[in-house]
C-alpha cells in the first residue's frame, strides 16, 4: 500500500502472486473476522475510521479514492481477473465528497458488478443533505453515516455484519437438518378413536310400566297402606296397665250406638 493510502497496480499484482489475494498458502479465514474496505480522500478521516474499525476487531484496507477502490476490487477495467472472485470483502465504507469519483459513483459501480453487488456499502458525509441521503439509499446503500463517525456507529455495523457472516456460513444450511431431526424424534401419532355402531345395542326406553296390575283407587291405597302407630310399645304397656282411663280415652272408645 502506498503512503497516501492507495494500492498500486504493482502492489496488487504482488498480493495476487504471493498470497494476499487468492494465495495458495493463505491463512484460514475466521468466520467472525470482518474485512472492511475504507475509502476516504482525507488522511485524518481515513485514520479515524481505520482505528475505529480495528477497535471492533475488523480487518481494514484503506484507500484514498474511488479509483483506488476499484483497482483493489479488480473493477478498474472491463476484464476483471478470475483471482478477484476469491477476494473477501464484507463491507465497503466510503466518503461521499471525493475528487475524481464521488462515493455515489463508486456505489453505482459496485452495484453494477456481479461479484460485489451483494456487499453492503455505507456512505459517510459531513453534510446532512436529505436529497443526497435518499439518493444513496435508493441506489442500494446499506446506511448513511454523518461525520465524525462514532464508535457506536461502527459497533452497530459490526454486529450486523457478524450475524450475516455466521448466517451465510452455516445457519441457513442447518435449518432443514434441524427440522428433520426434531420431526424424527417425535413419537408416531396414535390412530384416531372410532366407535362402531354395532359394538353396543341402542339404548331404548319402554313407555309401559313393569307392573301389569291395574292402578288402585285412593280409598284402596289408604286401606291397604300400613299405619304406623305413633305410640311406642312401652307407652302402650303403660296405657293398658293403668287402672284409670282418662275421660278423653273413654269417650273415644265408647261406641256411639250405646249412648
UniProtKB/Swiss-Prot annotation:
Role noted for this protein: Functions as a response regulator involved in His-to-Asp phosphorelay signal transduction system. Phosphorylation of the Asp residue in the receiver domain activates the ability of the protein to promote the transcription of target genes. Type-A response regulators seem to act as negative regulators of the cytokinin signaling. Modulates red light signaling through its interaction with the phytochrome B photoreceptor.
Upregulation: By low temperature, dehydration, abscisic acid (ABA), cytokinins (BA and zeatin), nitrate and high salinity. Induced by trans-zeatin.
Biased composition (Low complexity): 195-220
Predominant localisation class: nucleus
UniProt entry keywords in alphabetical sequence: Cytokinin signaling pathway, Nucleus, Phosphoprotein, Transcription, Transcription regulation, Two-component regulatory system
A cellular-component GO term for this protein: nucleus
Record bears the keyword Transcription regulation: yes
Family: Belongs to the ARR family. Type-A subfamily.
Stated name of the protein: Two-component response regulator ARR4
Pfam families given in the database record: Response_reg
Gene name tied to this protein: ARR4
Organism per entry: Arabidopsis thaliana
Cellular compartments annotated: Nucleus
Residues bearing PTM 4-aspartylphosphate: 95
Amino acid at each position: 500500500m502506498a503512503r497516501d493510502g492507495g494500492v498500486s497496480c504493482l502492489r496488487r499484482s504482488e498480493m495476487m502472486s504471493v498470497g494476499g489475494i487468492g494465495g495458495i498458502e493463505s491463512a484460514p479465514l475466521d468466520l467472525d473476522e470482518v474485512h472492511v474496505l475504507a475509502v476516504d480522500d482525507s488522511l485524518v478521516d481515513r485514520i479515524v475510521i481505520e482505528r475505529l474499525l480495528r477497535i471492533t476487531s475488523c480487518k481494514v484496507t484503506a484507500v484514498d479514492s474511488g479509483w483506488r477502490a476499484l483497482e483493489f476490487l479488480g473493477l478498474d477495467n472491463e476484464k476483471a481477473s478470475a483471482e478477484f472472485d476469491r477476494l473477501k470483502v464484507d463491507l465497503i465504507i466510503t466518503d461521499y465528497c471525493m475528487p475524481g469519483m464521488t462515493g455515489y459513483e463508486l456505489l453505482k459501480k459496485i452495484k453494477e458488478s456481479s461479484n460485489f453487488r451483494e456487499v453492503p456499502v455505507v456512505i459517510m458525509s459531513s453534510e446532512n443533505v436529505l436529497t443526497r441521503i435518499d439518493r444513496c439509499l435508493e441506489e442500494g446503500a446499506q446506511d448513511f453515516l454523518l461525520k465524525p463517525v462514532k464508535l457506536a456507529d461502527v459497533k452497530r455495523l459490526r454486529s450486523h455484519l457478524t450475524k450475516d457472516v455466521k448466517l451465510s456460513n452455516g445457519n441457513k444450511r442447518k435449518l432443514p437438518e434441524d427440522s428433520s431431526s426434531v420431526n424424527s424424534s417425535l413419537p408416531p401419532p396414535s390412530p384416531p378413536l372410532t366407535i362402531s355402531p354395532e359394538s353396543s345395542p341402542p339404548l331404548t326406553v319402554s313407555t309401559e310400566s313393569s307392573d301389569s296390575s291395574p292402578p288402585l283407587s285412593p280409598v284402596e291405597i289408604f286401606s291397604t297402606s300400613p299405619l304406623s302407630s305413633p305410640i311406642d310399645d312401652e307407652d302402650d304397656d303403660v296405657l293398658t296397665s293403668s287402672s284409670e282411663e282418662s275421660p278423653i280415652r273413654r269417650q273415644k272408645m265408647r261406641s256411639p250406638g250405646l249412648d
